[in-house]
């Protein structure tokens, strides 16, 4: 029984790390990356539609994104959505496609992005700790119901703590890498 709880705990912690890494992908580090626009939604025929469903997004060079809409009539709406997303990006259109030059990051902007990364890291750690709390609660219920002994409870709780420590250190490692990437000029 306690093995099942540990397996579920590990899966949930993996999901928390994966979600954190997806969040980090949207943080700009000076390079052009299509995932920068993942959170951009466009008002398209009355519905909020993700930009990546309305167009293809390419990276022709290190500091340039090119958006080619499937429907050319949506270009104006796409430009508005990018500006509204407050990513610090300025789209320019030639009627067929939208180009976004990725500006070099200022020192001030780099520091802001590092703060954002740290906030995401803290949220990920909280998610991992919540998984730990839930797992410990499940283990206590198993012990209360007589499915596991007190010794098994203690051993399993220690295993859950080891998992928590492992995933928190993974988050710290990923965070350090991202901070280094952001602060690189």
UniProtKB/Swiss-Prot annotation:
Entry's Gene Ontology cellular component terms: cytoplasm
SUPFAM superfamilies: Ribosome recycling factor, RRF
GO molecular function per UniProt: ribosomal large subunit binding
Transferase as UniProt keyword: no
Chief location bin: cytoplasm
Compartments reported by the entry: Cytoplasm
Deleted gene: phenotype: No sporulation at 37 or 47 degrees Celsius.
Disulfide bonds: none
Protein purpose: Responsible for the release of ribosomes from messenger RNA at the termination of protein biosynthesis. May increase the efficiency of translation by recycling ribosomes from one round of translation to another. Plays a role in sporulation.
Family: Belongs to the RRF family.
Official protein name in the record: Ribosome-recycling factor
Lineage: Bacteria, Bacillati, Bacillota, Bacilli, Bacillales
UniProt gene name: frr
């Amino acid at each position: 029984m306690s093995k099942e709880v540990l397996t579920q705990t590990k899966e949930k912690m993996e999901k928390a790390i994966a979600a954190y890494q997806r969040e980090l992908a949207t943080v700009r580090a000076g390079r052009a990356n299509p995932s920068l626009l993942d959170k951009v939604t466009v008002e398209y025929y009355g519905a909020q539609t993700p930009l990546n469903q309305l167009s293809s997004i390419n990276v022709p060079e290190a500091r340039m994104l090119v958006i080619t809409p499937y429907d050319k009539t949506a270009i104006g709406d796409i430009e508005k959505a990018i500006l509204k997303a407050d990513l610090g990006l300025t789209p320019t259109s030639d009627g067929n496609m939208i180009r976004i030059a990725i500006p070099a990051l200022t020192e001030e902007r780099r520091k802001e992005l590092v703060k954002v990364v740290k906030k995401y890291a803290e949220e990920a750690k909280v998610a991992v700790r919540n998984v730990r709390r839930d797992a410990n609660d499940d283990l206590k219920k198993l012990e209360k119901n007589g499915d596991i002994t007190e010794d098994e409870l203690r051993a399993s709780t220690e295993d859950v703590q080891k998992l928590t420590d492992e995933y928190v250190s993974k988050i710290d490692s990923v965070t350090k890498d991202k901070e280094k990437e952001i602060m690189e000029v």
